[in-house]
């Protein structure tokens, strides 16, 4: 697989399609639709599902989670369909769509490039790319959350193991993408990492206005 064999315009389409889908701010749209105001003025100000839960409306939070995960999955699935009917390499199409969706959520053009932290979108991407790893990611998050009561630590551990799971299941063509996505997750969570190291990161259920590991 090399760049000389690829249909460059189609790869750009996959990247841009992913970005546009990923940049849809479901948390913001749903909180406003529910009459709860601007999610950026609530809690941590993050547009993800965790902060949506701070509105007190669990259905808005669930909708945000589904929407954020769904846009990542849809971006990957649509690019896969496009690749199946064109000469573009499928792995590159899927990878660029996934990367675009993730970047769109983290840096949405509509919100001044200030978005969420990407965990919900990452879950959707993984489930669409290779669902066993998506399930392993979710299971890892749940186990670490149950033991530690830290949402951010759960996200960081699951993300760190993501490339390991892909390699273990012999999906080497996706390992490079997963390493890049993991790096972006850690950059987005740098504030959480600092608070974990200093012992000031809030545990699940604790009230705090600062950002935690959110979608």
Task: Give residue ranges: language-model regions.
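Helix-coil boundary and interhelical linker segments in multi-pass alpha-helical membrane proteins
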Residues: 1-13, 76-96, 127-133, 166-177
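Alpha-helical transmembrane segments in multi-pass membrane proteins
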Residues: 10, 14, 18-19, 23, ...
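A cytosolic-side transmembrane-helix exit/cap motif
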Residues: 113-117, 138-142, 174-181, 195-204
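Loop-to-transmembrane alpha-helix initiation sites
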Residues: 135, 151-158, 169-184
